[in-house]
Swiss-Prot record:
Site, as annotated: Role in lipopolysaccharide recognition: K100
Cell compartments where the protein resides: Cell outer membrane
One GO term (biological process): lipid A biosynthetic process
Source species of the chain: Dickeya zeae (strain Ech586)
Pfam families: PagP
Location (main, coarse): membrane
Tree of life domain: Bacteria
EC number in record: 2.3.1.251
Protein name stated in the entry: Lipid A acyltransferase PagP
Protein's gene: pagP
Amino acid sequence: MRLILISHSRLFALSALFLIPTFDSLSAENTLTDSTTLIDRTTQSDSTTQRDSKTRRDPAPSFWQRASNNLSETWQHPQSQDLYVPAITWHNRWTYDRAKTDKYNERPWGAGFGVSRLDSDGDWHALYVMAFKDSFNKWEPIGGYGYEKRWRPLENQDIQFGLGFTAGVTMRDNWHYIPIPVLLPLASVSYQRLSFQATYIPGTYNNGNVFFAWLRWQF
């Protein structure tokens, strides 16, 4: 009986010798896996933190920043020079007495010059100055910035339609040539280098409500 117990004890001891390295190996593998997982999570966390930090450092530009960038880019890197020729002034007959419109000038003789470019989206940006005869046949200068979103319905893209705005400053004789800020709608139809552009000056009865159009030639 004692011999049998001794044999069992030796067998148990030998089994333990074989099992201990196995447990050690499994423990090492688990430790390595846990370490790798921790490193991966730490790396992902660092990457997320860096992206969040970059987002906080580089916020989307504001409207004024975009406007300033567009003005600067148009002035410093124009793609074309433009000749402006005033074409027509029309006083809205539904908002004027005939006695008024009969004596108003609707032939805005004058000229202007500007620079322009197309951005990466194909939209139009311009800086310009222009002078023309106003409704009282007096000289009226205007200058500013123009923007149009452009559409090209044909495959050859020679014909373009534009819709946007112009912001600038004008001066009139009947207002003693005091600088007056203006913000007006802008629309155009273009064929290759020639554009017919127009704006509408809103107003009240017998005041404002004027359609003003001009030709623009790129060279």
